[in-house]
Amino acid sequence: MYGLIGKMRATRGQRDAMMDVLLASTGAMPGCLSYIIATDPADADAIWVTEVWTDQASHKASLQLPEVQAAIAKARPIIAGFEFQIETRPVGGFGLPAVKTG
C-alpha cells in the first residue's frame, strides 16, 4: 500500500469552501482505499488530508482523472499553500487489508 499525509492551508476564511471542493471530488477513485479530510482544531485555515492507495501508481493516475483535475482548478484560487506532505507505507488497520511487514 501507499499512503500520504498532508497539511494544506486555505486562504483566510476559505477552509470550509476548500473542504467542500475536496469532499466533492473524493468519489470512487481506482486504487483509493481511504481518503480522509480533517480540520485542525488549533488552526482555522488548515486542512489535513490522509490517503491510502493500493500503490503509488494508482495515486499518480488519479491526478489525471477529469474530476480531480476540475477540483484542482476550482480549489487553486483558495489554496494558500501546502505545509508538508509525507509518504507512508500503510500496513493495515481498521478498514484496510493487512500487509505482511516482513
Regions found by a protein language model. Name each.
Residues 1-47, 52-66, 77-102:
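Short S/T/G/P-rich N-terminal loop/turn motif that feeds into the first structured element of a domain
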